[in-house]
Amino acid sequence: KGWPTLNGSLTIDPKGPWEEDAPCVARLREHGAVIFGKTTMPEFGWKGVGECELTGITRNPWNLDKTPGGSSGGASAALAARMGPLAIGGDGGGSIRIPSSLTGVFGIKPNFGRVPMYPAGALANMTHVGPMTLTVEDAALLLTAISEPDYRDWTRLVYNNEDFTDGLDKGVAGLRIAYSPDLGYANVDPSVRKVVDAAAKVFESLGANVEEKAPGFENP
């Protein structure tokens, strides 16, 4: 409320009106969060890199010649630069996960309806609000807060007082995990493949059942 939300676009009037908080922001205020900034994004989230005509290029704090990814690249860059401990992102096709992986922070795309959204956009059934943080523990805490119900979103999941910090010590032993480093068709840089395979082996060492499995997508 009161802060322009321009979606990285020159087509939105910054004068507003900006009359109410989104559900996730309302929940954060109720829990005493201090909100001190908004971050950059490519226009309407349609890029996997951090650039737009409105704000220019957002750079990766670890290497200023590199991108922080997108579309929530401003959030990931701010976290990586230690400008704050928590951020909110939106993810349809990777817009939390891509920048989190490129800047070394933690981000998760919750399932549909987990975090209430309002107003709903045209892609609301695919694009979900989620936490971006410096640690898994902070992400669990943030997700617990922003997943609390909001009457404005009729697609929200049934709320059962979930506390996502309860699962932090459960481990992954016995879980079945499928992963695909190339989606069954993509060319993957050998260095990226090496890192992904090493991560899979870590889960195996922790007792998970890990299987490489292509999802059956056709090459777009």
Specify the residue positions occupied by each region the protein language model found:
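Activation segment
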Residues: 87-88, 187, 212
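Structural signature of FAD isoalloxazine-binding scaffolds in flavoprotein oxidoreductases
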Residues: 97-102
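Short, internal active-site loops enriched in acidic
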Residues: 1, 216-219
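A short helix-breaking turn/cap at a secondary-structure junction
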Residues: 106-199, 206, 217
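Short, hinge-like loop/turn segments at secondary-structure boundaries
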Residues: 53-56, 103-107
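Generic structural signal for helix capping and beta-alpha/helix-loop junctions
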Residues: 43-45, 95-96, 187, 220
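General small-molecule cofactor/ligand-binding pocket signal
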Residues: 36, 209-214
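Gly/Ser-rich catalytic/binding loops embedded in alpha/beta enzyme cores
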Residues: 1-93, 173, 199-201, 206
